[in-house]
């Protein structure tokens, strides 16, 4: 997670909750929040950033809680889907989890993958985060 946060100047002490669930729980979340009745690999839930805000310093736009901590949001990963994707991509499960965690954090920082250009940008940033995490 730190490898994703560093290039985006996320303030020290900013928190992200990372949760792992099974496919059934992920399907329920995906249906409830995205109206898609199937499992998915990762979902992110965070405070709404102002329109057009993404990337460097995006987290600084969020107000700290009473404890002074900025809670960037929650990232939920389907453990089973991560394992399937790791096998398909022929890389370790730890790399897939790092990629999915980075992907989730990027969403919390205002990035989107609904367009081709947004998808390519997030894919490149996610791969960069995994490479940084390996060093």
Locate each region found by the language model.
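Active-site rim/adjacent substrate-binding subdomains
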Residues: 1-96, 108-135
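Catalytic glutamate of the conserved HExxH
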Residues: 100, 104-108
